């Protein structure tokens, strides 16, 4: 399996290939090869900055002679007018890396900002915000990094690092007990040590899980606030609890106050607005 660094390198290479193709003809025709310059990253919207370390990799992978002076680090609150970094190098390199760097930093900063808003809503509770697999194909590692930068917690990275029995798994497996037992048989056969989480849709399924056991966490899918409180009381600390499904910015605090350990929010990544910023020539 590829490391995070290897995945980032492949993403950057692919992004340059799709953007530059056989050459940035606009830049090549009007900018001399030896022209040198400087550009600054200007913040145009309040939020949480994310993607600085990836941006440095973008510049250095394209042209190792580029010099990046970071003024504001990942995870720092920023406001309109802040200068986050200054980059010096060949003007051709500045122009050809500008859009990829902005695309990554705007999206990661938007996710970090959105995540931080949710996290601040839960201050004073023990509940942690989780992301989901509802990410942009190919960008998952970056988007999940942004969630962490914003103060959230990563759920499983993919299908390989945790067992999560959803409704379809249970239905196709012939029921909750069958699904859980098959998980344990499989993990033993393969010599794997993975946590098991199971989704329940109602109190009948919850009771079946409690009768069977053998899981680490129970996901309460589309439970109301009142039913969440009831379910948490029934589980009584025997397993970790997670609320999921239809939870909004307006309702998340109420769910946390019922005592769940985690709340997963797809909106952290699937419909986020990028943070406004620009990369302009400077003296």
Stretch-by-stretch model annotation:
Residues 267-283:
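Short, charged, intrinsically disordered terminal tails
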Residues 249:
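Cys/His-rich Zn2+-binding cysteine-cluster or related metal-binding knuckle/ribbon modules and their
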Residues 221-222, 245, 267-268:
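Short secondary-structure boundary segments
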């Amino acid at each position: 399996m590829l490391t995070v660094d290897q995945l980032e390198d492949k993403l950057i290479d692919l992004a340059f290939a799709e953007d530059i193709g056989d050459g940035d003809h606009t830049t090549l025709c009007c900018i001399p090869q030896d022209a040198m310059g400087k550009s600054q990253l200007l913040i145009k919207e309040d939020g949480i900055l994310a993607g600085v370390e990836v941006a440095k990799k973008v510049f250095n992978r394209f042209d190792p002679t580029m010099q990046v002076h970071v003024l504001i680090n990942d995870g720092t609150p920023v406001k309109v007018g802040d200068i986050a970094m200054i980059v010096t190098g060949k003007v051709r390199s500045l122009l050809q890396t500008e859009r990829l760097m902005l695309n990554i930093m705007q999206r990661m900063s938007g996710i970090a900002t959105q995540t931080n808003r949710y996290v601040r809503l839960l201050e004073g509770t023990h509940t942690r915000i989780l992301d989901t697999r509802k990410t942009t194909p190919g960008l998952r590692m970056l988007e999940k990094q942004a969630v962490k930068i914003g103060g959230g917690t990563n759920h499983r990275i993919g299908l390989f690092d945790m067992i999560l029995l959803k409704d379809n798994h249970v239905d196709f497996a012939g029921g909750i007990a069958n699904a859980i037992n098959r998980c344990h048989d499989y993990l033993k056969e393969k010599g794997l040590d993975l946590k098991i989480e199971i989704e329940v849709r109602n109190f009948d399924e919850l009771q079946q899980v409690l009768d069977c056991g053998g899981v680490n966490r129970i996901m309460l899918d589309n439970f109301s606030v009142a039913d969440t409180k009831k379910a948490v009381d029934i589980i009584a600390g025997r397993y970790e609890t997670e609320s999921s499904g239809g939870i909004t910015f307006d309702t998340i605090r109420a769910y946390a106050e019922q005592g769940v350990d985690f709340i997963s929010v797809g909106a952290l990544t699937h419909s986020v607005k990028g943070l406004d910023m620009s990369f302009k020539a400077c003296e």
